[in-house]
Curated annotation (Swiss-Prot):
Function comment: Cofactor-independent isomerase that catalyzes the reversible conversion of L-histidine to D-histidine. Shows weak activity with L,L-lanthionine. The catalytic turnover is 10'000-fold faster with L-histidine than with L,L-lanthionine. May play a role in growth of F.nucleatum.
Entry keyword Isomerase: yes
Name of the protein in its database record: Histidine racemase
EC number: 5.1.1.24
Subunit-level organization: Homodimer.
Catalytic activity: L-histidine = D-histidine
Record's keyword annotation contains Isomerase: yes
Extra facts: Was originally proposed to encode a lanthionine epimerase that catalyzes the conversion of L,L-lanthionine to meso-lanthionine, the last step in the lanthionine biosynthetic pathway in this organism. However, the authors found low catalytic turnover and low catalytic efficiency, suggesting that L,L-lanthionine is not the physiological substrate for the enzyme.
Activity regulation, short description: Activity is not affected by buffer composition (PO(4) or Tris), ions (SO(4)(2-), Mg(2+) and EDTA) or the PLP inhibitor hydroxylamine. However, the activity is hindered by iodoacetamide and Hg(2+), which are known inhibitors of enzymes with catalytic thiols.
Keywords, ordered alphabetically: Isomerase
Classification lineage: Bacteria, Fusobacteriati, Fusobacteriota, Fusobacteriia, Fusobacteriales
Enzyme class: isomerase
Family per record: Belongs to the histidine racemase family.
Active site residues of this protein: 67 (proton acceptor), 209 (proton donor)
Amino acid sequence: MDRKVQVLDFIKINPAGNITILIDNFDIYDKNIPKLSEEIMKETNLYAEQVGFIKDSHLQMMGGEFCGNASRAFASLLAFRDKDFSKQKNYNITCSGESKVLDVDVRNDGAKNKFLAKIKMPKFLSLEEINVDEYKLGLVRFSGINHFIFNIKENKETSFENIIDLVKKYLSNEEYSAFGIMFFDSDNLSMKPYVYVKEVGSGVYENSCASGTTALGYYLKKCKNLDRAKIVQPNGWLEYIIENDEMYIDGPVEIIAEGKIYIGK
């Protein structure tokens, strides 16, 4: 007897290295989204760092979290599909984990499938310095994700896994949908992002992270009065810009592929 197969429409997108799968024409509130996403992300499947589900102008992330890079990817897809798009256009979208409408400025980057997308990011709820065991971390809270800033030069810790376990323990009595740890090198303005999504029950080292870069930008503004910086990511770059007390994240987006994915039920 044949197993049933679920057929989904997908678009694979590269926002600054943070490989993202967007699933179209699907119930964005389906209860199986976390399980489906886990299957889609596998190395033996489409192989990505995160999955989002899109309908009209809304993006629903796999764990109900907010994601800046997926939002930039979604707006770039809208430009890619927009017959009226030529060089530049602004797109208003919404994303899970964030109640406000997001404004994304999309520009062509030299090819039909390549864009630069600048998103106005949500403001943080709180910014503080905390101590976790003997380590000092920055903690920037947003409505859809909590980001920890770990300065690897200052803390001199070689085991990132140890820090991840300590942060999980720190958050054990809190309600949250996702957390990130930005392992930041202050010498060369580079970072290695780790993001854990509670609903999916796993975390990944991402090749870039827009909300994490936002958190780092707010942190650097507070600590070093730095309004703008290009932050080197493991597989690309993202620039944060603070203008008139608003935070923007800018960087490249490339539409890689689209087609159908087959998932065994």
